[in-house]
Amino acid sequence: MSEFNKDDYLNDLPDPSDAEAAAQASSGADASAESGSAQDSAAQAPSNEGADAAPAAAEGEKTGEGQSDSADTLTPLGKAKKEAADYLEALQRERAEFINYRNRTQKEQERFRQHGIIDVLTALLPALDDIDRIREHSEMDDSFKAVATKIDKAFEKFGVEKFGEKGEDFDPTKHDAILHKPDADAEKETVDTVVEAGYRIGDRVIRAARVVVASPQN
């Protein structure tokens, strides 16, 4: 067994200055590693933030468009346009109602007018029949003829038409046959004699003509 040498032991111990330098070197390496890791994290962070920011920006644009549309309806111009459209629609409805009312009123007025004429004509029918008989069976003096002509023109002015002529085809819608007379020469039913003239306004028959009908022999 070798003898313990104190001087050799002391020489083998590490120098305090060398140990301190080694410690400083180790600390610097660790700090460099941490700094590199931090820089890598910082480099990745903007990339992630950019990826997350894109959908958020798109969503913000959509939200902005919705807010813009909503805000447009609330602007004075948007309100004015809406009010103008409402007023136009109401005006068109009122105009249509007025036109319908005017048409109904005109029809009512024409109906009342015709009723008034019919009432007057009905009241004068006996006198008109007497005038026609005088014309047919006797000579009328000039003064009486002038009065009869004025009466006829007055009724024509109000749309009253006299009808019923000898020889015309018999029509049960406007002729009232008081007698059917067989006629060997007749090929169809015709008016042989007008007893009382008929009167109508337009297509409306006020009184059918009273006639004698010539009928074909069987």
UniProtKB/Swiss-Prot annotation:
Organism whose genome encodes this protein: Bifidobacterium longum (strain NCC 2705)
Q: Keyword annotations for this protein?
A: Chaperone, Cytoplasm, Stress response
Write out the annotated subcellular location.
Answer: Cytoplasm
Q: Name one GO molecular function term.
A: adenyl-nucleotide exchange factor activity
The gene it comes from is grpE
BP term (GO), one: protein folding
**What's the source species' lineage?**
Bacteria, Bacillati, Actinomycetota, Actinomycetes, Bifidobacteriales
The segments labelled Disordered in the record are 1-78
Which family does the record assign? Answer: Belongs to the GrpE family.
Return the protein name: Protein GrpE
**What function is annotated for this protein?**
Participates actively in the response to hyperosmotic and heat shock by preventing the aggregation of stress-denatured proteins, in association with DnaK and GrpE. It is the nucleotide exchange factor for DnaK and may function as a thermosensor. Unfolded proteins bind initially to DnaJ; upon interaction with the DnaJ-bound protein, DnaK hydrolyzes its bound ATP, resulting in the formation of a stable complex. GrpE releases ADP from DnaK; ATP binding to DnaK triggers the release of the substrate protein, thus completing the reaction cycle.
User: Subunit notes for this chain?
Assistant: Homodimer.
Top-level taxon of origin: Bacteria
